[in-house]
Amino acid sequence: MVMSENSNISYCQAVANRTSFFTTAYNGIPETLILNTIFWVLLILLFTVLRHQAGDFGRLALVNSNGSKKRWTEIFYSRAASVVDPQPSTSTQVSPRPSTTSQGVPDSTPLSPIQPEEGLFGWIRVTLKLRKETILLHTGPDAVHYLSFQQHLMAVMALVTIVSLVIILPVNFLNGPKENPYDVNAFGRTTMANLSPDSPWLWVHTIITILYIPLVVLIMRRASGRNAFKKAATRTIMISNISSSDRNKTVVRNYMQELFPDVTIENVSIAYNISRLYVRNAEFERVHEARLYCEHHRNRDTLMVKPEMCSCKKENAYEYYQREERKLSGDVARLRASTMNEPLDIAFITVSTVQEAQNIVTHFTPGTYRQWHLVFAPSPDDLFWENLNVNKSHWYLKFFCVNAVLFLVLFFLSTPAMVVSLLNSRPWVKETEGKISPLVADFLPTLMLWTLSALMPVIVAISDKWMRHYTRSKQNYSIMTKCFGYLLMMIMILPSLGLTSAQALLEWGFLNQTDRWQCIFLPDRGSFYVNYIITAAFIGTALELLRFPELIVYIWSLLKAKSKAETPYIRKAILIEFPFGTHYAWTTLVFTIAIVYSVACPLIMPFAMIYICLKHFVDRHNLYFAYGPSNMISRKGGKIHSTAVTMTKFSVVILVLVMAMICFFRGDNGMARFLLLIISLAITLTLFTFMSPIKRCAATRRPSIVEIAGPAPIYVPDVLKDNGIRTSSVRPSAAAFGGYGSDSVSEYDSSQYSVNSVEA
């Protein structure tokens, strides 16, 4: 930025030097791009080789307990997870999901096989040719909504990229002052800082900034708009705050029938405290799977087990698991019996029609004796049954403590920019700075920042699982909003102000250092984010394909296993659901950074476009081939999707605010542009607050989930269903993943959905 005073120039340059050390032309962007491209090619080749070695086994092979000879690559990188057995199941196993009939026969439409992969890189063509109908049937409506959200972002970013390269970049590059302080090869010459404060060409940036508001809103509203999806009413109502004396099916049924005599009540279920039973049943499943493995093994007598992890003592595996199974079977039976004596204050009542349920929820008023709270029940699959026993007061206390600790740690102490600042202050860095290759010096900071910022969502996700949310949709929503907020502050807002932590932000406010505002969007700051997005686009997306975190969890589980007989159970347990909360936050953050910097630093947009395209391709592949189905159906189950669309509004709001501040602090000649931008910002905030053009999930009354004929979902946890102890072992236990994971592709009735109902 061309500052009005030399002192401000030196001050801002000093601030920039504390958060990055770029030394070459274009601030290391060519070097970072070259290194990232090389690493991306190597990682893609590694993934392709691993996938080719995996063979055509597919995700459904996980449920085959006889697959003892499978290699680890067959679990993570298998190629043929595309075909579902179209034949109805003839087993007597209890269906783990409401997508099956009461007899346990799947009633979903079988998937159409995709074309087989041909050649080493055939997986790329197969991924690109995946149809929306196939993804919907195979992975669930959440995946279709998520991919549709990304496609709308791609449309916005494509238009912004064209404007940035065709209009803004030539204006910035060709209309600098005669005595230009930037070299022709300097990155600053491509930014808005190249224009003098009194240049009339700055009106181009102002007008484009204002035009971006309707552009983003009109396109992104189609990602929710009339499809504020998965908010439809169901026939089942969840009743909470039931007193201990009323926790009985008969009492609940009679009271509701007395209040609503014209309503036909089909079923009443009481929730029970299954937290201990859930853990014990998971242990039983592990031992049961291991016993079956030993029973079908060719050399059953030679299989040995180590009862203790750090012990050399061994014994016959079949006898050990047989003994442990009998013991755990008795424990589970006793816990099931005791669980029935621990009813919770939650009940589920199913009526005959959606209209009757709507009438009950609308007209029910708590009485003087029974202060019940009625809401539409989430899907049984969306519930964490083992968490329903958590007291609300304890939950809110834990919520406050967890978020306070997260705020102190992530917001004040460990921002990525602070780590770079600390490294730059070390003497050995200053001594070796001239000796280090510029190629390495420009590449490592952004790679390190990307790595540190990638750890933050992991910390947030772990803490949220410890909080024990009641539903998967609420857990994903909480993770998404917190990750987006922390990432936005840590990755964009604080570094853009030349601050390394929120602590520095407070010090700045108390010391009244107004010169800081003049450091907004220095040329080096824009190049920093260009390098950051390049790293996220190439190395970040390639690592998402390889899924090293899941691989580490898998290897650690194998190391903890007492024998190789536990391997089939471990292989089932690694199939988790796609973490929508984290990925929504990451995608929206990069979109926000790109839009905010698109006017001041137009070179950021091509790389942001590359990021969203690669991210969409990688997520498309992983959703179909790597992760289990997701179906967060509840009255507010679509809130995570509609809120992600709403969060895109932050990009244009911050863009207008930043452009207004730049006009204000660059001298008196920009006051007209400043006033125009402030008026536009006020109008935008007013519309977003009172007349939001992006419809919220709660705004529509038209059901988007069609109630189908047949029995309603059974609101009973799997561990309490008939024959649940024995047959629940066919499901992959997700105890290690906080209740996530499944082995069935048809976990929901896909006939409830169509592609048109989940995509604008």
Swiss-Prot record:
- InterPro entries in the record, alphabetically? Csc1-like, CSC1/OSCA1-like_7TM, CSC1/OSCA1-like_cyt, Csc1/OSCA1-like_N
Q: Name one GO cellular component term.
A: lysosomal membrane
Localization recorded for this chain is:
Lysosome membrane
Q: What is the protein's major site of localization?
A: membrane
- What is the protein name given in its UniProt record? Mechanosensitive cation channel Tmem63
According to UniProt, the tissues expressing it are described as: Expressed in multidendritic neurons (md-L) in the fly tongue. Expressed in multiple humidity responsive neurons.
Where are the stretches annotated Intracellular linker IL2?
228-391
Q: Which gene encodes it?
A: Tmem63
